[in-house]
């Protein structure tokens, strides 16, 4: 299956468990977006036989720091340069604290049809230990909003944090 992955290497803050390359400064966001658009054009000839793209994935970092217009620009450029399936899964990773008025609706309108929510835990103590920017209530709130808008979504939970108990994990899963 052919797919396109966009790595968005920006975060609001550093989470204590993360080993990925990222920056907490957005000053290079526009040059990196331009580089991604250029890369799509350069890689066009590398896909054999005009193979169909079944998935576009925005990972990070924190792709939800992009505006819907920026996401749309990357999706549209991918469609201009590749044979993107009409029913392609287009996923964007998102942190609960990045939800803002109309954001989820605008992402859906530009073609995002799946969200992956980086909740990590529903327990305040664990969120603080991980240095997450959101709180438990924001996690519940974004899940409530997503369920009314998206048929397809996933969420991340971290198992085995220091001082975590089986009861904490069970409550997270429930």
How would you label these PLM feature ranges?
Residues 22-174:
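Conserved non-cysteine loop/helix-boundary elements of the Radical SAM core domain that shape
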Residues 1-4:
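Extreme N-terminal starter segment of soluble prokaryotic enzymes
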Residues 6-8, 119:
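Alpha/beta-hydrolase
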Residues 9-20:
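Local cysteine-cluster metal-coordination motifs and their immediate loop/turn environment
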């Amino acid at each position: 299956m052919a797919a396109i992955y966009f790595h968005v290497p920006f975060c609001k803050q550093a989470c204590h468990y993360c080993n990925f390359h990222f920056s907490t400064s957005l000053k290079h966001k526009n040059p990196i977006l331009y580089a991604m658009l250029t890369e799509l054009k350069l890689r066009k000839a590398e896909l054999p036989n005009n193979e169909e793209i079944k998935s576009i994935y925005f990972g990070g970092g924190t792709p939800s720091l992009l505006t819907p217009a920026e996401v749309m620009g990357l999706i549209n450029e991918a469609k201009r340069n590749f044979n993107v399936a009409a029913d392609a899964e287009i996923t964007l990773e998102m942190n609960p604290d990045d939800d803002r008025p109309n954001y989820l609706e605008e992402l859906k309108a530009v073609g995002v049809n799946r969200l992956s929510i980086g909740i990590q835990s529903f327990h305040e103590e664990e969120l603080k230990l991980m240095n997450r920017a959101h709180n438990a209530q924001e996690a519940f709130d974004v899940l409530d909003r997503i369920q009314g808008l998206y048929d397809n979504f996933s969420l991340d939970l971290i198992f085995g944090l220091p001082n975590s108990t089986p009861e904490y994990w069970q409550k997270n899963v429930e």
